[in-house]
Amino acid sequence: MKKAFNKFLDFSNSWTGTVVIVLLIIFFVAQAFVIPSGSMKHTLLVGDHLFVKKFSYGVPTPRIPWLEIKVLPDFRGNGHLINGEGPKRGDIVVFRYPHNEKIHYVKRNFAVGGDEVIFSEKQMFLRPHEGDEFIKANYPSEKIVNFAGKNFVKEPYDFPGIQYDEKINLFEQALYYLNAGKFAMQPVIVDNLAKIKDLAFNAFYFKVPDEEYFMVGDNRDHSNDSRFWGSVAYKDIVGKPWFIYFSLDDDYKIRWNRVGRLIDTVQNEPKYAQRARDERHDDGDKIE
């Protein structure tokens, strides 16, 4: 036993051993990512460097970092060597962009398979597939609204970093993308919502296919997400952000208050969202 252990130590101390161990960690345990855009502001910030747990939702089929070349075949056909439970509602998730698997996104899982989503001006609604009794038992009554005889939950997640930008009318931009055939949600009229001038509809609707996930950025009006390009299949799920190991602001100063913080801490404690709001930012009208 001691002899085998010594051989392992010798191997791990070699260049080959170091590379193999690092790749195994990246393939199966954790991988580093950098937040490149403001779509999750004020929860995750541009310049946050994260470690992502690769085993949060099963074990993904390993790929060479940056090149995204598969090391092994996709034996199960669902992008995972070992299946696991998929993302829960409200989870922050790292996944591959469905239209380009070399691009990674990080968003919040707004809805799971079978759920219904309504998006209108400055508000979003969720109908969990479990139905009315589940909604009444799991959400505060003041958030529950009824559309066409079905209960929905208005803004079901209370994380302090979730925000809308009063300077931006994303609904108008959604119309542009809809007319260009680049918007995934369907226009609908919802009687209980305010009418929008000159339009035959006042909201957008989407029902999430089974075993897929509807991903939305916390920075609602600056997020290119499932509202535009549809839901995310389980095969594209990479993992769950774990903790911030480094963070730089726009002036290349280290955000010491974020370094070493677990994502669960950052997303749940209001002081982190407030400090993020206190930073100087200029989103303009970008959708990222």
Where are these regions (language model features)?
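Hydrophobic membrane-insertion alpha-helices, especially the h-region
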Residues: D10-A30
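Short linear Ser/Thr-Pro motifs
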Residues: S14, S37-S39, S223
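Alpha-helical transmembrane signal-anchor/signal-peptide segments
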Residues: Q31-D48
